[in-house]
Amino acid sequence: MAERPEPARIALPRSPSSVGAARRFIAARTTAWSFPEPAADQLVLIGSELVTNSVLHARTALTLTLELRNDRVRISVKDR
């Protein structure tokens, strides 16, 4: 990747359906960013675990962010 893409964000409701939406979002981003399949699959799993935790324990909607930082990917989930 020559240029670092902008962080990718999605707002999600505090709902069990958000876990599937997060998985699809992460899969689409990792495909667009040309990640190899094993790494992309791991990111989908990690992201869905983070969203599941927020759905279970947060009291508000949440935001999932994916960010490329040099040779690393940062996944964050914040409740509002």
PLM region descriptions:
Residues 1-11, 55-80:
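Conserved beta-strand-loop-beta-strand hairpin that lines the nucleotide-binding pocket
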Residues 9-23:
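STAS-typified acidic loop motif
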Residues 20, 24-48:
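Conserved short strand/loop->alpha-helix "switch" segment adjacent to the catalytic nucleotide/phosphoryl-transfer site
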Residues 22, 50, 75-77:
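Hydrophobic packing within well-folded, soluble alpha/beta domains
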Residues 42-60:
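Histidine-centered phosphotransfer motif of kinases
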